[in-house]
Swiss-Prot record:
The lineage of its organism: Eukaryota, Viridiplantae, Streptophyta, Embryophyta, Tracheophyta. Expressed in a band of cells at the adaxial base of all lateral organs formed from the shoot apical meristem and at the base of lateral roots. It comes from the Eukaryota. This is Protein LATERAL ORGAN BOUNDARIES. PROSITE patterns: LOB. It comes from Arabidopsis thaliana (Mouse-ear cress). Pfam families: LOB. One of its GO terms (biological process) is organ boundary specification between lateral organs and the meristem. Residues 10-111 form the LOB domain. Belongs to the LOB domain-containing protein family. Keywords: Developmental protein. Not known; ectopic expression of LOB leads to alterations in the size and shape of leaves and floral organs and causes male and female sterility. GO terms for molecular function: transcription cis-regulatory region binding.
Length: 186
């Protein structure tokens, strides 16, 4: 959490970007190391240094790292897609889940159809028993989320998402019905 680079008098990315001296108690230093200048640049561009300072001062010290990582993710998403930001990524993933659920339902229907026809013919084994029924996992079985987000490597989800006109994911949003709306006609 604490930046070891301040011990060598290297300013944090925030102070370097803002062209000010990085003091020993700098609130940005633990979260914006000098090796990640784009992280602060994006956060500053979207939220502003003053607003981030106010936010960090209002939080408890153990909450600040998660807040900065969240701000950095949201800022990168907004820089990549000024219109939809994080909502574009969420909508894209929801549509992908919906499409895959339809594919799974179709495959299950095919399995059930073939299973019924082989059972009716008296074939040994019932294929219908093999139909996959997805079950939601109890919350205690979910894998832990990794709250650490590094801007040095781009988000895998955001890299897989196709880019539309102006970087928006308009063609993948549910309310567009597969038609990209050009020229801001919403």
């Amino acid at each position: 959490m604490a930046s070891s680079s301040n011990s060598y008098n290297s300013p944090c990315a925030a102070c370097k970007f803002l062209r000010r001296k990085c003091m020993p108690g700098c609130i940005f230093a633990p979260y914006f190391p000098p090796e990640e200048p784009h992280k602060f640049a994006n956060v500053h561009k979207i939220f502003g240094a003053s607003n981030v300072t106010k936010l960090l001062n209002e939080l408890l010290p153990h909450q600040r790292e998660d807040a900065v990582n969240s701000l950095a993710y949201e800022a990168e998403a907004r820089v990549r897609d000024p219109v939809y930001g994080c909502v574009g990524a969420i909508s894209y993933l929801q549509r992908q889940v919906h499409r895959l659920q339809k594919e799974l339902d179709a495959a299950n229907a095919d399995l059930a159809h073939y299973g019924l026809s082989t059972s009716a013919a008296g074939a040994p084994g019932n294929v219908v028993d093999l139909v996959f029924q997805p079950q939601p996992l109890p919350s205690q079985q979910l894998p832990p989320l990794n709250p650490v987000y590094r801007l040095s490597g781009a988000s895998p989800v955001m890299n897989q998402m196709p880019r539309g006109t102006g970087g928006s994911y308009g063609t993948f949003l549910p309310w567009n019905n597969g038609h990209d709306q050009q020229g801001g006609n919403m």
